[in-house]
UniProtKB/Swiss-Prot annotation:
Component of the cytochrome b6-f complex, which mediates electron transfer between photosystem II (PSII) and photosystem I (PSI), cyclic electron flow around PSI, and state transitions. This is Cytochrome b6-f complex subunit 4. InterPro entries: Cyt_b/b6_C, Cyt_b/b6_C_sf, Cyt_b6/f_cplx_suIV, Cytochrome_b_C_euk/bac. CDD domains: cytochrome_b_C. The 4 large subunits of the cytochrome b6-f complex are cytochrome b6, subunit IV (17 kDa polypeptide, petD), cytochrome f and the Rieske protein, while the 4 small subunits are petG, petL, petM and petN. The complex functions as a dimer. The lineage of its organism: Eukaryota, Cryptophyceae, Pyrenomonadales, Geminigeraceae, Guillardia. PANTHER family: CYTOCHROME B. It is a multi-pass membrane protein.
Amino acid sequence: MSVLKKPDLTDPKLRAKLAKGMGHNYYGEPAWPNDLLYIFPVVILGTLACVIGLSVLAPSPIGEKADPFATPLEILPEWYFFPTFNLLRVIPNKLLGVLSMAAVPVGLITVPFIESVNKFQNPFRRPVAMTVFVFSVVFAIWLGIGATMPINKALTLGLF
């Protein structure tokens, strides 16, 4: 049921485009009706069947009932907020804590202006960007691990 459009290789315009490495829109299998009517619905229905099947076969547990009068011993944020939570917890001045969190996007915005090389180059040829990236990832992991510890070990992780 698919429609196949064959190229007219005697057409001089098409031959000129093919010589330049272009012309892929003039031949081959068109998206309508082949992809849009036959392939996409199969993929969408297959994905829907997988999601419904998994939710029926392995439902997620509800857990224990919430008690509004029982406060947990330690309230921690989700794991992706651990570095910022630890930063706010460790810095005594809250204004400095908020400004240090605002310094992260400002620092990321300044990296392209500090290092003005071709953005399509190998990342290992961009030493400033790679140094900032590696340092910030290590620092975020360090702060994230420290957020799970008591406040007196939050920065040193109990190593020093």
